[in-house]
């Protein structure tokens, strides 16, 4: 509860009311927020740190080839990896969106902790996605067929949410670029549909 009071105090100091009821952020608060980096924060032993450790262990357990399976199959490339299950199962309309979340989460961990193992896995996934985009030959990149977009726009049935999935993939790639400086991830985020 004490942390909530500090947060409220911070907001009270950082935001002030100007004449006419407009909100304005003080320059010093803005500068402080702009200087804020994820590695400047250390989580104390708590349920939050336990959850971060649990999620980090899960992300480390994921093999890049399994994450790339549906992308490769969709691009006509061979894959001998065991497909992921659940939302990423082959044939599921949202396949690919979890990989976007993976990219966002792992890039945040790499930025924060400079974990070499996670950085290598992230690089492998980006390189694998690049190979898939090249195999498509038209700039397209996803774990579902490009025709799903046409089906959605013309028949309105039979597909789930291709634009949502593309957004997750693009956001993940942008996060990789912004957090790690990976130029290839940025180029990949410019998906052509």
Label each region the model flagged:
Residues 2-9:
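Sec-dependent signal peptide recognition
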Residues 10-18:
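Hydrophobic h-region of N-terminal signal peptides that target proteins for export
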Residues 20-98, 119-146:
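Low-complexity, Ser/Thr/Pro/Gly-enriched N-terminal "stalk/linker" regions
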Residues 39, 90-104, 117-120, 160-168, ...:
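Aromatic- and histidine-enriched alpha-helix N-cap/loop-to-helix transition segments
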Residues 40, 46-50, 102-116, 168-182:
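Well-ordered alpha-helical scaffold segments within catalytic/enzyme domains
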Residues 136, 140, 164, 177-184:
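Mature catalytic domains of secreted/periplasmic carbohydrate-active enzymes
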Residues 148-160:
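Aromatic/His-enriched, Gly/Pro-containing loop or helix-boundary segments
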Residues 191-193:
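Conserved small/polar residues in nucleotide/adenosyl-binding loops
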